[in-house]
Amino acid sequence: MDCQEKLEVPVYTDVDKETFLRDIYPQRRPAVLKRVPIGPCVRTWTVCFLAEKGGDREVKVHVSPEPRMDFLHKNFVYRTLPFDEFIKRAAEAKHPEFFISEDESYYLRSLGEDARKEPADLRKQFPELAEDFHVPQFFEPEQFFSSVFRISSPGLQLWTHYDVMDNLLAQVTGKKRVVLYSPEDALHLYLTGDKSEVLDIDSPDLQLYPEFVKARRYECILEPGDLLFIPALWFHNTLALQFGVGVNVFWRHLPSESYDKKDPYGNKDPVAATRALQSLERTLGILDELPPDYRDFYARRMVLRIQSRAYIRKPINAAQENSDTT
């Protein structure tokens, strides 16, 4: 999309824990990490190997007649397949057997044993495969939350969303494009909960979403073996350029009591944020008691108060000050 400011995600090589914590993590910005050892999976996780090791255990997958997943209109269904059959279908362009159409797309986001209570953990759900994947030790073991297996058909695009925990996306096989947007640009993304309504980020409907052009677009291409550090609250949209296998590793970077204890997916807002949003809804209900012009006026006052009280103020550097005064 040419009308958006486009920025490259910085790339680092041969990063160890010390370098990550000193030079990358404090910036709270995405970073591509190359040549970080993640185990033999980059070499061994072929379609045949995955099918053999994963076997016929059943997995619940997304099936869509088109590669761009649409959470607004739910253009996908959930179906259960043996893992080896799923792998075979996800890797092929045309399917002799199918649910919707012969060119349907598949997407797996692995779940815990009891999806309502347990987070996904590659070591528990796929122990035969987990031994080939080494979790980068960029955080303390007690901070670990989940390791999520992600497998996509070629061309599959997942909608723009944010997560409330820091995470590393390990691209094991295939290439993937990732587009990210800063939390500061949330006002331009037309959010419904944790997701952006702008599904086609490459050719958006600017009559429907005119503010979207103001969002700065960070973009990178992940190669097999690459890691992408995605800080919490950064919006991201993924496009599988090839059949792809990856692992998302999430960890708690806030105190454990900040998170909803009944959230096995790790995507619920922090407890305090949830309370604040609930209070906001009650406040908006009170504003509805006012005539429209008064409601508009006091809503604007409230926005100003939130900006002055809660927004992070960025320091103005000397060069910017001089340019502003000349």
Swiss-Prot record:
Q: Which residues form the JmjC domain?
A: 106-268
Q: Which InterPro entries match?
A: Cupin_8, JmjC_dom
Q: What GO terms describe the biological role, i.e. biological process, of this protein? A: wybutosine biosynthetic process
**Pathway participation:** tRNA modification; wybutosine-tRNA(Phe) biosynthesis
Q: How is the cofactor bound?
A: Binds 1 Fe(2+) ion per subunit.
Cofactor dependence: Fe(2+)
- Residues noted as binding 2-oxoglutarate in the record, renumbered to the chain: 107, 167, 176
Per the record, the similarity remark reads: Belongs to the TYW5 family.
Q: What does this protein do?
A: tRNA hydroxylase that acts as a component of the wybutosine biosynthesis pathway. Wybutosine is a hyper modified guanosine with a tricyclic base found at the 3'-position adjacent to the anticodon of eukaryotic phenylalanine tRNA. Catalyzes the hydroxylation of 7-(a-amino-a-carboxypropyl)wyosine (yW-72) into undermodified hydroxywybutosine (OHyW*). OHyW* being further transformed into hydroxywybutosine (OHyW) by LCMT2/TYW4. OHyW is a derivative of wybutosine found in higher eukaryotes.
Describe, as the record does, how this protein assembles with itself and its partners.
Homodimer.
Identification of the protein by name? tRNA wybutosine-synthesizing protein 5
Species for this entry: Danio rerio
> Which gene underlies this protein?
tyw5
